[in-house]
Amino acid sequence: MISAFVADFDGTVTEQDTIDPLVRLAIGQLEQSDAQLENWLSLSRQYQSQSTAVDNSFFSEFSSLESFVSNFHKTVEMPALEQVVSQKFLMGLKKEQLHQLGQKTKKKKLVEQVLIKLRRKSVRIEILSANWSTDLIIGAVGEYCDLITANDLLFTNEDPITTTGEIKFKITSAQHKLSRIEQVMNTYGKTAFIGDSINDILAICHADIGILIGQNQLARQALRYFEIPFVDIQLGSDYFPDIHSGSVIGLRSWSEVDFFLKTHKLPTNHEPSNSSL
């Protein structure tokens, strides 16, 4: 049995990414919101176009998965984050609004049941997310978690309940997530990590049990291009530890996560070689 279960948040635990609703909540409070909303939509469209792989040429100049995601962070993710801060997209939010948005966020079916079952078995539960608001995540799943590691919207001493638009960054890259997974494995032992995107991929590859949930095309294309062992497991299908040990496990839903953790004999010594990254 695993000792720790670590999950990404947006798109893994949640039905939809919470970033857009978060920004729209802040922009909606402005007296003149149209221009700021258009700025946000423009940035969102640019990010989406930059994070969609059309063919293998998207990866061809990189020698490894690790070098690809490092470049993706520098050229796509960080410029977008800098725009979010410089344009003050997240200014003017109250802490209570962040909690409430988290409470209203729709979670994927069976997420809560799976987390509750794991807690009952004394498995440590962590959320590891590049989301901009830990307070939002607390509102959504705080009651199920031992630790949430994410970013924080900043407040000032003069107004400690209203966001400034600045962000205290802790987790912005795949490498940051990998570092935390290594800490969890070293501290607690056998660890499962579940994520849905390219930002999760190094942690997925390194965890004792690495699960890619959903159909994110960039993540799947990257795994194929860099020849990372990968196997899709469906409800009722067979999992063979001797064959599949070291492979990224592809699952479509939390019902499959529940079935996989509950019924499949899991490997006792899954430690993918770093040379595969």
Feature map (PLM): residue ranges:
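A broad structural signal for alpha-helix termini and local helix breaks/kinks
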Residues: 3, 26-27, 141
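N-terminal intrinsically disordered, low-complexity tails enriched in polar/charged
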Residues: 1-5, 36-42, 272-277
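Asp-based phosphoryl-transfer active-site loop
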Residues: 2-19, 204
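C-terminal cap/substrate-recognition subdomain and adjoining C-terminal extension
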Residues: 102-277
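Residue-level signature of transmembrane alpha-helix interfaces in integral membrane proteins
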Residues: 24-31, 212, 224
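Short secondary-structure boundary/capping segments
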Residues: 20-23, 208
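Alpha-helical structural motif
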Residues: 15-18, 77, 177, 253
